[in-house]
Structure formats: C-alpha cells, structure tokens
Amino acid sequence: MAAKIKKGDKVVILTGKDKGKKGDVVAVFPKENKALVQGVNMVKRHEKPSQTATGGIVTREAKVHLSNIAIQDPKTGAPTRVGFKTLDDGRKVRFAKASGETIDG
C-alpha cells in the first residue's frame, strides 16, 4: 500500500497533549505505524556520558502513532485526509480530500 504520510510532510496532531500543533515529519516507521514529528511529543531522556557527548537529561521528540496525525491541507492549513489519483501523464500523486489540492508534484 502506498504511504499516505511521508518524510518532509507538514502534519497536524489530532489528539493528545500536543493536539493542534503542527510540524514536519522527520522519519516514518511503517512497521510500527509511527512517525517522528519535529517539535512534537517532547520527552526527557536520561543519557549516560560517552566519549563524544556529555550525559544528563536531554529533551527530544518521541514517535507519534499515525492515527493521531493528519496531513496539513496545502490550501487551508487544516488537517485533511489523503487520497490518491493518477494524473494525465500517468503519475500517481497524493491529494487533500478536503480541498482537492495535490500534495506532491
């Protein structure tokens, strides 16, 4: 099945402590059905010191389940569902179902 959310997409968080926040997808983990979104779902990690980095409490992003995020509509900025359509030149592209605007290409 084609990926509805890809690296670099602008997304909106639908549920949880970061509801309504917007960010870019840094990485997608299809086997886990999760994605890493920049600046969202921040957690504190206790890291041991290593030769390259000092230890301490580090704040970083945690993975978010794909069901809790939606693509940001390119036209309105609101969360939208994603559909697929084939263009006249034969390319398969994603489009926002709310506005009909193509997301990639």
UniProtKB/Swiss-Prot annotation:
Protein function: One of two assembly initiator proteins, it binds directly to the 5'-end of the 23S rRNA, where it nucleates assembly of the 50S subunit.
Swiss-Prot/TrEMBL GO biological process terms: translation
Protein's name in the database: Large ribosomal subunit protein uL24
A Pfam family assignment: KOW
NCBIfam families assigned: rplX_bact
Annotated InterPro entries: KOW (IPR005824), Rib_uL2_dom2 (IPR014722), Ribosomal_uL24 (IPR003256), Ribosomal_uL24_CS (IPR005825), Ribosomal_uL24_KOW (IPR041988), Translation_prot_SH3-like_sf (IPR008991)
GO cellular component: ribonucleoprotein complex; ribosome
HAMAP family: Ribosomal_uL24_B
Superkingdom assignment: Bacteria
Source species taxonomy: Bacteria, Pseudomonadati, Pseudomonadota, Alphaproteobacteria, Hyphomicrobiales
Subunit structure: Part of the 50S ribosomal subunit.
GO molecular function list: rRNA binding; structural constituent of ribosome
Record-linked SMART domains: KOW
